[in-house]
Amino acid sequence: MSEQPFWQQKTLDEMTDAEWESLCDGCGQCCLHKLMDEDTDEIYFTNVACRQLNIKTCQCRNYERRFEYEPDCIKLTRENLPTFEWLPPTCAYRLLAEGKSLPAWHPLLTGSKAAMHGERISVRHIAVPESTVVDWQDHILNLPDRAR
């Protein structure tokens, strides 16, 4: 009988830093700029990528020093996770916090990011560089809800 994977054995609070980091599927959705409606506080995703996001790989160009380059970059931690209602419905942190399973395409289950990209969960097919954007409201989008 095989042992359950760590994300089924532990709560988010019990995970090591390495386990916590490995939950990230690398989709890049959290690296897209968001807009907030001033009247309703509703959050809208855009397809505008952070300047540090390599759109092709969906990875941060300067992950270890990202806060130096992007002061508005937000670090997701165990402590502040409950305040991030804007996380996409496919996000492993959000799913596990809500008591749900990882989706079948998640790299921890498949061993690679190919299935995630194939399901078009990553932003590589929709993101545009921040430097090319004139009117941010023209870039509001709806992200896929494929958390299965």
UniProtKB/Swiss-Prot annotation:
Taxonomy, superkingdom: Bacteria
NCBIfam families: PRK05170.1-1, PRK05170.1-5, PRK05170.2-1, PRK05170.2-5
Family statement drawn from the similarity comment of this UniProt entry: Belongs to the UPF0260 family.
Protein name: UPF0260 protein KPK_1978
Organism: Klebsiella pneumoniae (strain 342)
Taxonomy of the source species: Bacteria, Pseudomonadati, Pseudomonadota, Gammaproteobacteria, Enterobacterales
